[in-house]
Amino acid sequence: MFKHIEPVTIPEKKLFFEFKEKEMVNKLHRMIGKDNFNLLTQRLEKQGMKKGVTVLLYGLPGTGKTETVLQLGKTSNRFIMLADASKIRSKWVGETARNIKELFDEYRKTAKDLDETPILLFNEADALIGKRHDVADRGDQEMNTMQNILLEELENFEGIFIATTNLVDNIDKAFDRRFLYKIRFEKPGTETIFQIWRTKFPKVKPAILKNICSKVTLSGGQIENIRKKVTIDTILHEHFTVNEAYLMELAQQELLLENRIHLRHPIGFTRK
């Protein structure tokens, strides 16, 4: 139902955010650092408050929500337990609810076995915490039962729980107060996007990257896709040269599914 991600296996990545997101992400890094987290949980417990930290990261695809959680795990040296929604949900009566219970039981067991409290990550959480409907069939009843258990688990949660979603409007309102922090990830502005381009393509002239940024607005995830395509073409074609036309064409391709543009020319790379 989930996989363990060890902090040492997570590649370090520099992430770029707009001011508000950066401020909140930095707060999360400070909160779950070993010394601060232990102090926070002790103080909260002393004041009769629940010790769990629950966070919802929401916003457009490719804005760094999942990678943010991975970097939180790396910098705080915490294991990440990544829940697999497709394996939690079951067609068998009662099994989805049992799976949720087993997941949290396993989290508690793992937390006792480790030196540092792990992070429980529900990626694309709308599959599990989407809006509930009137019970029309057994599937609806099963989903509602599972969500009631999940609500109860989060109400009494002790640890670090982070959920991500691209579809915040689909999340059931009952989960609103279960999240201590709700952080919105916007598509980065021009200057932030330029910094991402420079990090991904340090050998390309800044003027070229600035020109691309002024014409095409992409997310960090889309720029990473371009970087991967460039790497593939560099491997496949000897004496491959990256030029502005080639990068612009790849940038435009990333927007095809958003129905913003239509390609009219072949990809403009040069090779000998």
Give the label of every model feature segment.
Residues 2-30:
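Charged, amphipathic alpha-helical linker segments immediately N-terminal to NTP-binding catalytic cores
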Residues 19-214:
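Walker A/P-loop NTP-binding motif of AAA+ ATPase domains
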Residues 1-12, 178, 187-272:
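C-terminal alpha-helical "lid" subdomain
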